[in-house]
Amino acid sequence: MYEYIKGEYMGINKDYIIIENNGIGYKIFTSGATMSSMPCCGEKIKLYIEQIVREDFIGLYGFESLEELEMFKMLLSINGVGAKAALSLLSISRLNNLKYAIITGDEKHLCRGVGIGKKTAARIILELKDKLKTDELLNCIDEFDDVTQDNSLAVSEALSALISLGYTEKEAEKVLRDVDKSESVENIIKSALVKLMG
């Protein structure tokens, strides 16, 4: 139903961002990669959108690039992979690293995603391996960074947000040790995501 949305970026709230368009604030679920690239509040952005409608839920999922949106749709086509798991896979590493993991059959990497077990990881590899261009292997570098608990409320909220994106508490804590804790929750999350995604 929707192709994209343009509007003012209003901020991050755990696993979604808010974009205001014509006086309406849209709640848009997104990946760590898209979250980490958000501009300052009030600046204009454009996200490519996928709407998911279920009996008990209607949600908008937005991505900075068409390539990431297409990968999201491909992941959703796999039996056993829901929107939360797909976003988690797109949040644990950069898009090219995810493709590299699928092409090379790296089940261990895929199992880092929320709700992704060995069987689901194997299914993702089996069904998507041939759909991804093997020449993309040349552009994919498999690198992994590992997200900190602090007494401050801001860091605690950032930790919760990173875990909801699919990172383990250990990963979240590790990265948050190195961020500037005097920043806002939003900037702490952005800094952590940049570190996590290399």
UniProtKB/Swiss-Prot annotation:
Q: Where are the disulfide bridges?
A: none
The stretch of residues making up the signal peptide is none
Q: Where are the transmembrane segments?
A: none
Chain segments carrying region Flexible linker: 144-154
Print the keywords alphabetically.
Answer: Cytoplasm, DNA damage, DNA recombination, DNA repair, DNA-binding
Checking InterPro entries in the record gives: DNA_helicase_Holl-junc_RuvA_I, NA-bd_OB-fold, RuvA, RuvA_2-like, RuvA_C, RuvA_C_sf
Q: Which Gene3D superfamilies match?
A: 5' to 3' exonuclease, C-terminal subdomain (1.10.150.20), DNA helicase RuvA subunit, C-terminal domain (1.10.8.10), Nucleic acid-binding proteins (2.40.50.140)
Give the GO cellular component terms, alphabetically. Answer: cytoplasm; Holliday junction helicase complex; Holliday junction resolvase complex
Location comes to:
Cytoplasm
Q: What are the boundaries of the region Domain III?
A: 154-198
Region listing for Domain I, in residue ranges:
1-64
Pfam families listed in its UniProt record? HHH_5, RuvA_C, RuvA_N
For the region Domain II, give the residue spans.
65-143
Name any one GO molecular function: four-way junction DNA binding
Name one process (GO BP) from the record: DNA recombination
Show the domain comment.
Answer: Has three domains with a flexible linker between the domains II and III and assumes an 'L' shape. Domain III is highly mobile and contacts RuvB.
Checking NCBIfam families in the record gives:
ruvA
Q: How does it assemble?
A: Homotetramer. Forms an RuvA(8)-RuvB(12)-Holliday junction (HJ) complex. HJ DNA is sandwiched between 2 RuvA tetramers; dsDNA enters through RuvA and exits via RuvB. An RuvB hexamer assembles on each DNA strand where it exits the tetramer. Each RuvB hexamer is contacted by two RuvA subunits (via domain III) on 2 adjacent RuvB subunits; this complex drives branch migration. In the full resolvosome a probable DNA-RuvA(4)-RuvB(12)-RuvC(2) complex forms which resolves the HJ.
Family note:
Belongs to the RuvA family.
Q: What role does it play?
A: The RuvA-RuvB-RuvC complex processes Holliday junction (HJ) DNA during genetic recombination and DNA repair, while the RuvA-RuvB complex plays an important role in the rescue of blocked DNA replication forks via replication fork reversal (RFR). RuvA specifically binds to HJ cruciform DNA, conferring on it an open structure. The RuvB hexamer acts as an ATP-dependent pump, pulling dsDNA into and through the RuvAB complex. HJ branch migration allows RuvC to scan DNA until it finds its consensus sequence, where it cleaves and resolves the cruciform DNA.
Q: What is this protein called?
A: Holliday junction branch migration complex subunit RuvA
Native source organism of the sequence: Clostridium botulinum (strain Eklund 17B / Type B)
The record lists the lineage as: Bacteria, Bacillati, Bacillota, Clostridia, Eubacteriales
Tell me the gene name. Answer: ruvA
